C-alpha cells in the first residue's frame, strides 16, 4: 500500500482504537494514510504510546505533557518524560503534545508556561521537534518559541488563529497543522489562512478521535479522514493535488525524520 498521506496528529492510544488497532490501521491504509504520529498527553500513557509504536509499523510516538491536563502533571511526570527521552526509543519522533491553553476558569497559566519551558528545554537537549497545542495563546506561545530557538522547531497543531499569527510561527520555522476545521464552511478565517500560507509550512492531521469533520459530527474522528481533509485542502489551494500531496509528505519527513 502506497503511503500517500501521513496523519501527523492522532491519539491512537484512545478509544475507539484501543482493541481495534489492526482494523483501524487497515482502514487508514485503504484511504492512503500509511503512517500516523501518536502524541502522548500525560506520563501515565507514555508506555502505551511507546508500545503502540513498537508493535505497529505505521505508528510513531511523541511524548509530552498536555497543558489541558495540568492536574495530572507533577514534577515526577517531568522526570518521567526526561527519563523516557534519555532512553532514545527509535520510534519517538517528537516531544508532544505540549503547549498552552487558556480554556477554563483556572488554567494555572504560570504553571503551564513553566511546564512548557521545561519541555522545550528537553526537546532542545534531545534534538527533537515539538508538537504544540495552543488555545487562545498564539502570541504568548510564539514568545516562548522565539526565546528557546529550537533547532528542530515543530508544528502548531489544529491551528485556528489569524494569518498574522500563523505567519509569525512560520517565520520562526514552525509548521501549521491542517485538520478537520477547514471542512466547515463557516470556518472562513481558518480556511483563508490555510489557503494563503506557503505550502512548505503545512502538515496534514486529524486529531482523532477528536475534531470530527463536517458531516461527521457526533462520531469519533479517525485517521482515514486525513484523506477528506486533504480533498478540502486541495479545493482551497491553487496547486495541483499531486503537488500538494507530495509537499505534505516532504514537510512531514523533513520535520519529524519519519523513515
UniProtKB/Swiss-Prot annotation:
Enzyme Commission no: 3.1.-.-
Pfam (any one): TatD_DNase
GO CC entries: cytosol
Keyword Transcription: no
Signal peptide stretch: none
Coiled coil (UniProt feature): none
Organism: Escherichia coli (strain K12)
Binding-site residues for a divalent metal cation 2, renumbered to this chain: 97, 133, 157
Cofactor: a divalent metal cation
Keyword terms of this UniProt record: Hydrolase, Metal-binding
PROSITE patterns xref list: TATD_1, TATD_2, TATD_3
Record text on cofactor binding: Binds 2 divalent metal cations per subunit.
Gene name in the database record: yjjV
Taxonomic classification: Bacteria, Pseudomonadati, Pseudomonadota, Gammaproteobacteria, Enterobacterales
Protein name per its UniProtKB record: Uncharacterized metal-dependent hydrolase YjjV
Similarity-based family: Belongs to the metallo-dependent hydrolases superfamily. TatD-type hydrolase family.
Annotated GO MF terms: hydrolase activity, acting on ester bonds; metal ion binding
Amino acid at each position: 500500500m502506497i503511503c500517500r498521506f501521513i496523519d501527523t496528529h492522532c491519539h491512537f492510544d484512545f478509544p475507539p482504537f484501543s482493541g481495534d488497532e489492526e482494523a483501524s490501521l487497515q482502514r487508514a491504509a485503504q484511504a492512503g494514510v500509511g503512517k500516523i504520529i501518536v502524541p502522548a498527553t500525560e506520563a501515565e500513557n507514555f508506555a502505551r504510546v511507546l508500545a503502540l509504536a513498537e508493535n505497529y509499523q505505521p505508528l510513531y510516538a511523541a511524548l509530552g505533557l498536555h497543558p489541558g491536563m495540568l492536574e495530572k502533571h507533577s514534577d515526577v511526570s517531568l522526570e518521567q518524560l526526561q527519563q523516557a527521552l534519555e532512553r532514545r526509543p527509535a520510534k519517538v519522533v517528537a516531544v508532544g503534545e505540549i503547549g498552552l491553553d487558556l480554556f477554563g476558569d483556572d488554567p494555572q497559566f504560570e504553571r503551564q508556561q513553566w511546564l512548557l519551558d521545561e519541555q522545550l528545554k528537553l526537546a532542545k537537549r534531545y534534538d527533537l521537534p515539538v508538537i504544540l497545542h495552543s488555545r487562545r495563546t498564539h502570541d504568548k506561545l510564539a514568545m516562548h518559541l522565539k526565546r528557546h530557538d529550537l533547532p528542530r522547531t515543530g508544528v502548531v497543531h489544529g491551528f485556528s488563529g489569524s494569518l498574522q499569527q500563523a505567519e509569525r510561527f512560520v517565520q520562526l520555522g514552525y509548521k501549521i497543522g491542517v485538520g478537520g476545521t477547514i471542512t466547515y464552511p463557516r470556518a472562513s478565517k481558518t480556511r483563508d489562512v490555510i489557503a494563503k500560507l506557503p505550502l512548505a509550512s503545512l502538515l496534514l492531521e486529524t486529531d482523532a478521535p477528536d475534531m470530527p469533520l463536517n458531516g461527521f459530527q457526533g462520531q469519533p474522528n479517525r485517521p482515514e479522514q486525513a484523506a477528506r481533509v486533504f480533498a478540502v485542502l486541495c479545493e482551497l489551494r491553487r496547486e495541483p493535488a499531486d503537488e500538494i500531496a507530495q509537499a505534505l509528505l516532504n514537510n512531514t519527513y523533513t520535520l519529524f525524520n519519519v523513515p
